[in-house]
From Swiss-Prot:
It is an enzyme of class 2 (transferase). Gene3D superfamilies: Thiamin pyrophosphokinase, catalytic domain, Thiamin pyrophosphokinase, thiamin-binding domain. InterPro entries: Thi_PPkinase (IPR006282), Thiamin_pyrophosphokinase_euk (IPR016966), Thiamin_PyroPKinase_B1-bd (IPR007373), TPK_B1-bd_sf (IPR036371), TPK_catalytic (IPR007371), TPK_catalytic_sf (IPR036759). This is Thiamine pyrophosphokinase 2. The gene is TPK2. The lineage of its organism: Eukaryota, Viridiplantae, Streptophyta, Embryophyta, Tracheophyta. It catalyses: thiamine + ATP = thiamine diphosphate + AMP + H(+). SUPFAM superfamilies: Thiamin pyrophosphokinase, catalytic domain, Thiamin pyrophosphokinase, substrate-binding domain.
Length: 267
């Protein structure tokens, strides 16, 4: 019964073309629009590439310090001030307890919208940023919007857990958490998933596992160690240190799963 239900599900297509110098989409996937959210952690080396691809750039509070301080090191522009003025976020959102006063003043003078949410201490800065994007994006456009989040992995584990929780809180949106080493995305149980591997920028190591609720049946193709109606839960078996073996990985499950894949040394 479960197998028949899953096979009839709509297919959700995923790819990491946003990591490439030039965007392209799988033939059967509609064109994606990207939004970039920068958190207050060291910038991954490929942030300038993401910045170029994104139509909307939001800094979460102290993420503005990172753009102000670190983008110059990632570009070939010898003019420090020119680099700063070229990378201006459309919005800076958060409780404003981390952004430095001179950084806030600079971006405000360059036209960035400063959205002070210091009155709201119930949610994280990332939650505030994603809430804004979710609120401002019509429902029919959400499936073709992909939100890229840098600085979401690494540092304190409770911060990482809160960031992963965002994937579940906003499961109707495509959100990708990124670090220099890997990415994480949610594969909702409501869909069958096709993941197109960009082997020049990602892989081969990958993982697939449920968080919060167990999976009673997960089936994959395209991996070195495929799953066939496998049960997964913490305290038992989960798929880690797996290897992608094909250009396309497929996943079907009765539970929401996290997909993670290693990133190559991008410059």
């Amino acid at each position: 019964m479960l197998g028949r239900a899953i096979r009839s599900m709509e297919v959700m297509v995923h790819s990491s073309t946003f990591l490439l110098p030039k965007l392209h989409q799988p033939a059967n996937s509609p064109a994606k629009k990207y939004a970039l959210v920068v958190l207050n952690q060291n910038l991954p080396r490929f942030v300038p590439r993401l910045w170029t691809h994104a139509k909307l750039r939001i800094c979460a509070d102290g993420g503005a310090n990172r753009i102000f301080d670190e983008m110059f090191q990632m570009t070939n522009d010898p003019d420090y001030e020119s680099t700063r003025k070229r990378y201006i976020p459309e919005i800076i959102e958060g409780d404003m307890d981390s952004i430095r006063p001179e950084v806030k003043q600079f971006y405000s003078s360059q036209g960035s919208k400063i959205s002070d949410k210091s009155h709201n201490q119930e949610t994280t800065d990332l939650h505030k940023c994603i809430s804004r994007i979710h609120r401002c994006t019509p429902d029919h456009e959400k499936t073709n919007l992909c939100v890229l989040v840098t600085g979401a992995l690494g540092g304190r584990f409770d911060h990482e857990a809160a960031n992963i929780n965002i994937l579940y809180l906003f499961s109707d949106m495509r959100i990708v958490l990124l670090s220099d080493d890997c990415l994480i995305r949610l594969l909702p149980k409501t869909h069958k998933h096709e993941i197109y591997i960009e082997s020049s920028v990602e892989g081969p190591h990958c993982g697939l596992f449920p968080v919060g609720a167990p999976s009673g049946s997960t089936t994959t193709t395209g991996l070195k160690w495929n799953l066939s109606e496998a049960k997964m839960r913490f305290g038992s078996m989960i798929s880690t240190s797996n290897i992608v073996h094909a250009e396309k990985v497929t996943v079907q499950s009765d539970a929401d799963l996290l997909w993670t894949i290693s990133l190559r040394n991008l410059t």
